[in-house]
Amino acid sequence: MKIGKFVIEGNAAIMGILNVTPDSFSDGGSYTTVQKALDHVEQMIADGAKIIDVGGESTRPGCQFVSATDEIDRVVPVIKAIKENYDILISIDTYKTETARAALEAGADILNDVWAGLYDGQMFALAAEYDAPIILMHNQDEEVYQEVTQDVCDFLGNRAQAALDAGVPKNNIWIDPGFGFAKSVQQNMELLKGLDRVCQLGYPVLFGISRKRVVDALLGGNTKAKERDGATAALSAYALGKGCQIVRVHDVKANQDIVAVLSQLM
C-alpha cells in the first residue's frame, strides 16, 4: 500500500493515536511529557501501528481552542523524539498551516486536517510544497444535511479537487468521512451504512471512529471510552470490508489481528 511516496507493507494499516493534549475525550493528559509519549509510541509500534498520528489540540465537542504557538510547543518535541528513536511514519493532526509546517520541519510525514484545508486556505499549498500526503476529513459547523452520505461524498470530492487545483498530486490525497464531527448518532449510523459510497470516490479512505459516541450508542449507551475498543475493532473489520485502507484507533493491539487477516484478503 502506498501513501504518496511512502510504502507500507500490506493492503491496510493501523494509524495509532497519540494525543499530547490535556483534554482529549479518551486519553487527555496521559501523554503530555515526551517520555510518556515515547513509551506509548513504542507500545503502539510493537502492537502493529504503521503510522503515529500526533495531535496537540483536542477536537472533541466543546474543547478549548489552542493557539498555533501552544500547539507547536506540544507536538514538535514529541515528533522530533519519535523520529530520533523509531522508524515509523508520523502524521500531524492539525488544521493550522503554521503548526503543520513546524511539524513537517520536525520530521512529520503526513498532514491530517480535520477541516480539509478550509481553516486558513494555505494547507494545500503547504502539502504541495513539501510533497506531503494529506488526509482531508469531512467537517462542518452544524448537523444539517440533505442526505448525509451524499453530502459527505460531495464535500470530499470538492475538497479533493481543490487540493488538486492547488498542486497536490492525486496520489497524495486521502479522504476521511469524519465520523463524530458535526453528525448526530443517527447520521453517523447512516454514514456507516453508506461507507462503500465514500470508498468509490477514487481516493483511499481513512476510517476513524475509535471510542466515539456512535460506538457507545451501538453498545446500548453508558459505556466508558476505553470499554468501546472491542466494538471499535468490529467496526474496523466492517470498514476494511467496505474498502477503507487505514483505521485510526486508540487501542492498536485490539485491531491488529483484524487488519493483518483482512489485509491479505483485500
From Swiss-Prot:
One of its GO terms (molecular function) is metal ion binding. It catalyses: (7,8-dihydropterin-6-yl)methyl diphosphate + 4-aminobenzoate = 7,8-dihydropteroate + diphosphate. InterPro entries: DHP_synth-like (IPR045031), DHP_synth_dom (IPR006390), Dihydropteroate_synth-like_sf (IPR011005), Pterin-binding_dom (IPR000489). It is an enzyme of class 2 (transferase). (7,8-dihydropterin-6-yl)methyl diphosphate binds at residues 59, 93, 112, 176, 212, 248-250. Keywords: Folate biosynthesis, Magnesium, Metal-binding, Transferase. The keyword Phosphoprotein does not apply. GO terms for biological process: folic acid biosynthetic process; tetrahydrofolate biosynthetic process. It comes from the Bacteria. Mg(2+) binds at residue 19. GO terms for cellular component: cytosol. NCBIfam families: DHPS. Homodimer or homotrimer. Catalyzes the condensation of para-aminobenzoate (pABA) with 6-hydroxymethyl-7,8-dihydropterin diphosphate (DHPt-PP) to form 7,8-dihydropteroate (H2Pte), the immediate precursor of folate derivatives. Belongs to the DHPS family. This is Dihydropteroate synthase.
